[in-house]
Amino acid sequence: MSRLVSLLRRRGVVLPSFEIYGGVSGLVDYGPVGARIKRRVIDAWIEHWGSITNVVEVDSPTITPEPVLIASGHVGEFNDKMSECRSCGGAFRSDHLVAEFHEAPDTLGSSELDELIERKVVRCPSCDSFDWKKAMPMNLMFQTSIGAMGGSRVAFLRPETAQGMFMLFPALYRHFRQKLPFGAMQTGKGYRNEISPRQGMIRLREFNMAELEYFIDPDDPPIDDLSKWPDRVCMIPDPDGPRPGEIEISFEEALESGIVKHPTVAWFLAMTMDFLEFVGIDRTKVRFRQHAGSEMAHYASDCWDCEI
């Protein structure tokens, strides 16, 4: 990873932000080459999903009032576990500290993380001490205020673009003449106050997002022809489910066997593979990993990560 980051920096693709003032971890600049690549990827994404006749593009604010994020669950649930070193005061994501000792450390609870840190004698990456406070949840949103002084309202920089699209649902519903299904897509900035950003661009505090929200009638879901995607892909189903482990399977077979829980999800997985191939990704380097129940986002009933 360090060699890749060094190469991207030398070639003017991605560089650390504010470097002459010491820099800030989790913030990057796109140089002349990187900005052009980013623009081409975003344009390709919009072209791909915009080709669906019942999907439109929207643009909503990055500042989100607190009530919206209370309703979505982000104020109460959008957390990572943090461990603080008593010796130097350094704060680190607890699951990152034990990543080499557990296959899925982000699924562990606070007490399990504390036990593993103690059992494996995990030392502080900054000062090499072994004196940790108990792991505790830290909300990942940047808080701000709207207005001045006593009349201000609590708000947050959006952690994702989805909430803006949900707020637009009544307008979108009217736009589509009150008929489901339909979708809205949006690109733009997202913000997450990561505890300990690392891995180059993998964990950033300000990052670019491209999201699509697709609204269906759960009692009358759209049925798409998945036979158009006969090729098998690499999938890693829920490790706690009936078929754990890596398998090669088509999207249609994955739906019929119950691995993918909904036809719309299967269709979007297939369309995602099409997009990746369109921008030049080798399909043999792609896999789809299903989230375990303990890993699932607080609002999800099924979730898949596309990993390259």
Put a short name on every predicted segment:
Residues M1-I308:
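TRNA-recognition modules of translation machinery and tRNA-sensing kinases, especially anticodon-binding
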